[in-house]
Amino acid sequence: MEVQKIKPEPACYHAVNPEKLRTARFLERPNRFLVRCSLEGQDIEAFLPNPGRLWEILLPGTELLISKDGVREGRKTAYTVIAAKKKNTFILLHTHLTNDAAEFLLKVGKVPGLEGWRVAKREAVFGRSRFDFLLEKDGRRLILEVKSCSLFGERLAMFPDAPSDRGRKHVEELAGLAEEGVSGAVLFLVQ
């Protein structure tokens, strides 16, 4: 099966510049990808790159970490939500940054069971799906799908926090590829 590289959309994938980070207070969530929050006493809207329900995190008054990205073509808001604070800890909500965190953990050998594997490609296409990583080790290949787990209790993490056709499709596709002899895994990043 051929691996293809898909170009990421520039409006979605970018590193977080610490100088652009601000704290705001969550007010409401009009839709899956938009929040209203209070920034320095002014109500603003921010893009939320996370379609999960997040009911236990996005409560009125919750502290948000947002990035001022500016309005440009293809964007409706000047801000993007990066994380939300819960019990003195920020929970990463920017799902596109989850893969950056996973790649870092892979590179420094901090993912149990995946020590020594290197990232050969990001956004690799196999079958009908695009997967987060193609890893290589000693001539072997492994498809890795990364999922951010933001629904949790004291000692319990749950995924997904909402029905996910895309998530189900990825798991089914990984199972089908495994039947063809292609190795695959799912990495859950629990925060």
Feature locations, PLM:
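OB-fold/S1-family single-stranded nucleic acid-binding modules
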Residues: 73-88
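Short aromatic-glycine-enriched beta-strand elements
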Residues: 31-36
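Structural detector for short beta-strands of small beta-barrel domains
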Residues: 18-28
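Short nucleic-acid-contacting surface segments enriched for D/E, G, S/T with interspersed K/R
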Residues: 52-65
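Short alpha-helix capping/helix-loop boundary micro-motifs
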Residues: 44-54
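Short, charged beta-turn/beta-strand-edge "cap" motif at the junction between a beta-strand
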Residues: 28, 68-74
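A short acidic/basic microdomain associated with nuclease active sites
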Residues: 110-126
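Conserved catalytic cores of phosphodiester-cleaving nucleases, focusing on short active-site segments
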Residues: 24, 131-161, 174
